[in-house]
């Protein structure tokens, strides 16, 4: 499953089902109806505002 993760200018980390867009104020928004998921700020420290959004792949481990 491919998703996108992006960090806002204020450090909020969000997971999106579709590629998000960034507002002029530095906040990432998805084109979905509230299916975005806010993650803990300390997760994925390699994702910064400057390199967002990042495409990630999630796999179930059995």
Role assignments for model-derived ranges:
Residues 3-8:
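A short beta-strand micro-motif
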Residues 12-22:
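Short, surface-exposed terminal/edge motifs of secreted or surface/virion proteins that either
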């Amino acid at each position: 499953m491919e998703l996108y993760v992006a960090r806002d200018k204020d450090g909020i980390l969000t997971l999106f089902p579709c590629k998000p867009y960034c507002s002029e104020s530095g906040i990432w928004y998805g084109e979905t109806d509230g299916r975005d998921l806010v993650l803990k700020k300390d997760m994925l420290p390699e994702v910064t505002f400057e390199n967002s959004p990042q495409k990630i792949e999630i796999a179930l481990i059995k």
